[in-house]
Amino acid sequence: MGIISDNAQSHSSSSAPAPSIFSSSFATRIFSDVAGDITIVVDGESFLLHKFPLVARCGKIRKMVAEMKESSSNLSHTELRDFPGGSKTFELAMKFCYGINFEITISNVVAIRCAAGYLEMTEDFKEENLIARTETYLEQVAFRSLEKSVEVLCSCETLYPQDIAETAHIPDRCVEAIAVNACREQLVLGLSRLNRGTESGELKRGDSPEWWIEDLSALRIDYYARVVSAMARTGLRSESIITSLMHYAQESLKGIRNCKERTKLDSGTFENEQRNVLEAIVSLFPNDNVPLSFLFGMLRVGITINVAISCRLELERRIAQQLETVSLDDLLIPVVRDGDSMYDVDTVHRILVCFLKKIEEEEEYDEDCCYENETENLTGSMCHSSLLKVGRIMDAYLAEIAPDPCLSLHKFMALIEILPDYARVMDDGLYRAIDMFLKGHPSLNEQECKSLCKFIDTQKLSQEACNHVAQNDRLPMQMVVRVLYSEQLRMKNVMSGESGEGLLLSSQKHSSENPSRAVSPRDTYASLRRENRELKLEISRVRVRLTELEKEQILMKQGMMEKSGHGGTLLTSLSKGIGRISIFGGGPTEGKLRNANRKSKSRLERKTVRSRPESMF
């Protein structure tokens, strides 16, 4: 009789006699006076056995013997093809038929159960037959433990024929047992933590909610996918599922760097396996956010092994959902094709498209919902904040890829113009990126330079950037003139008495005149912050220029004292000259400050000719 035991107290299969001695051993012990009357061949090995104990428990052998009698064929020789587990498992099944005890273990229970099903060792022929014994072991031992259920499922992978275990529904039951046990352990761990409170102690293997992750990594991808799907159905935490997916991917795809070398040896088998693994893992992602670094890693691997387009688009969509938290290193995706640019800007462009689509959908949803104004403004502010973060990241990304000589102007401009104007409070970062692109692509003609510089809003450049523009010989003259003109207009506005308080009051008045229209943070909050910052910068510049004018006034007085004989003529000439170069067109009411400021601007332009910087930053 077969023994269901975890202890090796009975005769083990490893200590069984060789097949050539197998039948004679049974004959001397049980049927010492009866010679073997049937020979069964399994995987090329012959077993000389007795019909009586076999037909008493094996329905298949009983049918075979009956058919041989009817056909008057050789009654003493037959072959069992595609026997589950091979000759070793058949030997254990024969031991059971002869009443010899052996050990059923986690490693052999699947093979024995499938062999019993193949031989039709059901209760119809004998009570407590081999199928019933193995089922009892599975239910009472294997399926009650997550770890043992995983081992049983792993043994299903190596069994031949591969689909024989499915006929007994063993993989399905293993999958459900793993999912149920994982959820049970998650619940038990939570309750134990509540009972323990703040008490400290060493964590055992079962105290960690994800201790089983390492065990699942040994599964084949199709079985692993079934386990993860079952865990999601039974309510396992998404964090645990994501952690398991990340660990499985790292273990399964860690040899991807040598993928090209391996594919030459095995005709693409390794690459196909990696592709199937990656696509399956992506399809198992829960709705919760997956860590960005892991998503970018999967995307890089997917590009390398050329995964399906749908898989790449799903990864790009998930990255776009949390693009505001991305780092510059994540965006620098190398190109795998030779002769192209260094970085994959097309992928980044698609990610930006998905991100902007998400922002647009969120804004439309907020408009459709009848929430209070505070809630609407808060949601809009969050969207605008995400846009500003992405704008800063993209400026850094543009500056990083700009020196690449293989990067085309068309792709560079496409990355710039995809973001709206309100995604940047200041254009200093954009100007820096464009300047680096011009420096790395000296062959651009004047028209191409103009089309590139048109994206820079001169009103959103800091004083430092404006000073750099005025001395940058890589820029078209039209760009320099626009910056100088913007500087003059800003100075005129500052000196005419416009202040931040006036802008704020004007904005509030405009809002009060349109009470039915919801104020968009994109149009008010960001613009007010930008204008306040510009006003502070203008005030600082005015103070510096006033100091310079005071110094110039002292120098002028000293010169007039030295040339007292021509003092009146010199003063008259200076007054006329300053009046002619007055930019604002003001009369005497404008004061000496504006006239002297024009002289300072002329001196700045003369300095431009003397020195040209190589780079802004």
Curated annotation (Swiss-Prot):
Residues 210-490 form the NPH3 domain. Residues 505-525, 585-617 are annotated as: Disordered. Pathway: Protein modification; protein ubiquitination. This is BTB/POZ domain-containing protein At3g08570. Belongs to the NPH3 family. It comes from the Eukaryota. The modification Phosphotyrosine is found at residue 431. PANTHER family: OS12G0117600 PROTEIN (PTHR32370). The keyword Nucleotide-binding does not apply. It comes from Arabidopsis thaliana.
